[in-house]
Amino acid sequence: MAKKKGNLGSSTIAQNKKARFEYHIDETFEAGLSLAGWEVKSLRAGKAQLTDTYILIKNGEAWLLGSHITPLNTVSTHVVADPSRTRKLLLHRKEIAKIFSRTQDKGHTCVPLKLYWKKNLVKCELALVRGKKLHDKRATEKARDWNREKARIMRAH
């Protein structure tokens, strides 16, 4: 019997770390992405950024706006590659309706948290979020610093 390949590394392609700091996460969803061939090759090379990215629901479809996938030099020689084009998210109708209704509420939006591989498919973890106030951000940072300090103390003893 042939052995299965182990996990050769992390399946995460890109993370939106800023989103976890700037927003309260209410609910998360998993969506597929509709990509071109050169984009998949670039994602395998880890050339993706999710900072300042958001999700727009238009005409019953979900779109990923502001994401940046840098094309490789060896790929897309005959196709003009647009690194920041809008990409379609593949979700169920009920999920799209839920996201649309929640984003209509004041102070709510939908942002991607990370891109990752699931078998051989690219998936996007997205979340319905509410913006944090400045004092919430300070409290989050203070709690994170205290947890780090506790870990240092525990390691020392």
Curated annotation (Swiss-Prot):
One of its GO terms (cellular component) is cytosol. One of its GO terms (biological process) is trans-translation. InterPro entries: SmpB, SsrA-bd_prot, SsrA-bd_prot_CS. The keyword Signal does not apply. Keywords: Cytoplasm, RNA-binding. Required for rescue of stalled ribosomes mediated by trans-translation. Binds to transfer-messenger RNA (tmRNA), required for stable association of tmRNA with ribosomes. tmRNA and SmpB together mimic tRNA shape, replacing the anticodon stem-loop with SmpB. tmRNA is encoded by the ssrA gene; the 2 termini fold to resemble tRNA(Ala) and it encodes a 'tag peptide', a short internal open reading frame. During trans-translation Ala-aminoacylated tmRNA acts like a tRNA, entering the A-site of stalled ribosomes, displacing the stalled mRNA. PANTHER family: SSRA-BINDING PROTEIN, TMRNA-BINDING COMPONENT OF TRANS-TRANSLATION TAGGING COMPLEX. This is SsrA-binding protein. It comes from Chromohalobacter salexigens (strain ATCC BAA-138 / DSM 3043 / CIP 106854 / NCIMB 13768 / 1H11). The gene is smpB.
